[in-house]
């Protein structure tokens, strides 16, 4: 199959990478796993066993008129432990390489079908200026965009850093969440070739 390149000849690409059927279930599973892997999982609370305080019975069982109590660290007391205390945990989910690659291919194919993938010969700017990048994006009628280059262009990265709906990645740094998060995905010809090799 062929992809149209802005201001250049069409680019022949693999049908298995850019012409794959949309697999919503697979994409959902991979995106959920990716988001789960980004969680810190460092939350921690103390149980009644871990809270500081004496284990002595505060007052005798009977005869005081007060409610019976055996421990000042009880969860129903102020400063007591937490009943079902949260503990640090690893939220990551296992995703096979084949599944991950399949999800990326499915997303790329859907971007092509929806005309959201814009292929350009090159995407460069002369200086790390946000103003210059904004002007270049206006020329291409782009606003909410992910820019993918073969290798990370420092000028481009620095210029895009202060723009709300613009992100710059190299071909190695693409992930399913960023691919579906933007309205358009601009990718250079060299990056397309690199992505094809990576997903082969």
Curated annotation (Swiss-Prot):
Output a single Gene Ontology CC term carried by this record. ribonucleoprotein complex
Q: Which GO terms describe its biological process?
A: translation
Keyword annotations from UniProtKB, A to Z = Ribonucleoprotein, Ribosomal protein, RNA-binding, rRNA-binding
Region entry Disordered, spans: 43-71
Question: Recorded GO terms, molecular function?
Answer: rRNA binding; structural constituent of ribosome
This protein's record includes keyword Ribonucleoprotein: yes
Pfam families, sorted: Ribosomal_L4
Q: Does the keyword Transmembrane apply?
A: no
Relate the assembly described in the record: Part of the 50S ribosomal subunit.
Query: Which family, according to the similarity comment?
Result: Belongs to the universal ribosomal protein uL4 family.
Q: What does this protein do?
A: One of the primary rRNA binding proteins, this protein initially binds near the 5'-end of the 23S rRNA. It is important during the early stages of 50S assembly. It makes multiple contacts with different domains of the 23S rRNA in the assembled 50S subunit and ribosome.
Query: What is the name attached to this protein's record?
Result: Large ribosomal subunit protein uL4
What species is this protein from? Answer: Aggregatibacter actinomycetemcomitans (Actinobacillus actinomycetemcomitans)
**Taxonomic classification, please?**
Bacteria, Pseudomonadati, Pseudomonadota, Gammaproteobacteria, Pasteurellales
Primary gene name = rplD
């Amino acid at each position: 199959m062929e992809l149209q390149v802005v201001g250049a000849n069409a680019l022949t690409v693999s049908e298995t990478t850019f012409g794959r059927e949309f697999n919503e279930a697979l994409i959902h599973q991979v995106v959920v796993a990716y988001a789960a892997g980004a969680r810190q999982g460092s939350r921690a609370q103390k149980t009644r066993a871990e809270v500081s305080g004496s284990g002595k019975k505060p007052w005798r069982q009977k005869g005081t008129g007060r409610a019976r109590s055996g421990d000042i660290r009880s969860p129903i007391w102020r400063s007591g432990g937490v009943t079902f205390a949260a503990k640090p945990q690893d939220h990551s989910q296992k995703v096979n390489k084949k599944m991950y690659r399949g999800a990326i291919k499915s997303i790329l194919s859907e971007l092509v079908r929806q005309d959201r993938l814009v292929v350009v010969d090159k995407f460069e700017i002369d200086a790390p200026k946000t103003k210059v990048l904004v002007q270049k994006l206006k020329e291409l009628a782009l606003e909410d965009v992910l820019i993918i280059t073969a290798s990370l262009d420092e000028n481009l990265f620095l210029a895009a850093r202060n723009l709300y709906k613009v992100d710059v990645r190299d071909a190695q740094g693409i992930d399913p969440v960023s691919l579906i998060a933007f309205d358009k995905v601009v990718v250079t010809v060299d990056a397309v070739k690199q992505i094809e090799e990576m997903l082969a």
